[in-house]
Amino acid sequence: MKKIILALIRFYQKFISPLKPPTCIYTPTCSEYTYQAVKKFGVFKGLFLGFKRILRCNPLHEGGEDPVPDKFYIIKGRRLD
């Protein structure tokens, strides 16, 4: 399942994303962040982090550098093992 999700993200990056203007306020982009998160934490945790990131990607947030965290947290500072 992980390989399928990663392939779908790459498909989006190569064929869909170039058709629209860049809108992501973060580095790496939201799709790359989600790709890295799925690769690092697995499908469910990675997609959860990607979903949280996409919700933050709007004009109400500052944007900037936002790498995938080293550890998985649902709420900042509260680790879920």
Curated annotation (Swiss-Prot):
This is Putative membrane protein insertion efficiency factor. It comes from Thermosipho melanesiensis (strain DSM 12029 / CIP 104789 / BI429). Its main location: membrane. SMART domains: Haemolytic (SM01234). It is a peripheral membrane protein. It is found in: Cell inner membrane. One of its GO terms (cellular component) is plasma membrane. Keywords: Cell inner membrane, Cell membrane, Membrane. PANTHER family: MEMBRANE PROTEIN INSERTION EFFICIENCY FACTOR-RELATED (PTHR33383:SF1). It comes from the Bacteria. Transmembrane segments: none annotated.
